[in-house]
Amino acid sequence: MSDISRRDFLKTGAMALAGITIAPSSILGMSHGHVSPSDKLNIAAVGIGGMGHANINKVKGTENIVALCDVDWKYAKRVFDEFPKAKKYWDYRKMYEEMGKSIDGVIIATADHTHAIITADAMTMGKHVFCQKPLTHSVYESRLLTKLAASTGVATQMGNQGASDEGTDLVCEWIWNGEIGEVTKVECATDRPIW
């Protein structure tokens, strides 16, 4: 699996917010591939096993993983071990309370029925959110999150790899533009089980 660049991460989705630059990029050698620590986002993750771990790996190395939260520490141990500097939590509310001022964005990959409330709490704090599907379980929850996004101005994305993956977009463009001719057969592979 190849690493995703910061540009691709912001474009395809996880979260978007430019940090305040303390030192000019030219001084830090940005043209040579170096990134100022102040240009990195501070990311927290809730639900870090399975898809949560996969989502964290998409930003590992390009962003700062500062806090991790999971109710099953036995299952989450491998991720905790991978990010020893990140603060560890059982309860996302405690993580938000203690780390809120230092978090730029949150990755949410918990049990489906908890997505909306964890997302709403993060958005209310002004945090950018990448949340796994399904984002909500009701029209009410969807409307609430839509209003929160509008009122807070945060960037949000729901993870739907089948529709939001950069490769999927590229192939669709090729087909729509007639660049590869008529498609008569498609073969797919999957990395299951990822959980």
Give the role of each language-model region.
Residues 111-112, 116-164, 178:
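Beta-strand-loop-alpha-helix segment that lines the small-molecule cofactor/substrate pocket
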Residues 13-83, 162-165:
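N-terminal Rossmann-like dinucleotide-binding module
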Residues 95-101:
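Short amphipathic alpha-helix with an adjacent loop that forms part of the alpha/beta core around
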Residues 65, 85, 103, 180-183:
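Local beta-strand N-terminus motif with an aromatic residue
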Residues 106-107:
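N-terminal Rossmann-like NAD(P) cofactor-binding module of classical short-chain dehydrogenase/reductase
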Residues 1-17:
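N-terminal secretory signal peptides and thylakoid transit peptides that target proteins
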Residues 47, 51, 55, 152-158, ...:
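Predominantly a Rossmann-like dinucleotide-binding segment in NAD(P)-dependent oxidoreductases
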Residues 87-91:
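Short acidic-hydrophobic, aromatic-tinged amphipathic segments that line or gate anion-handling sites
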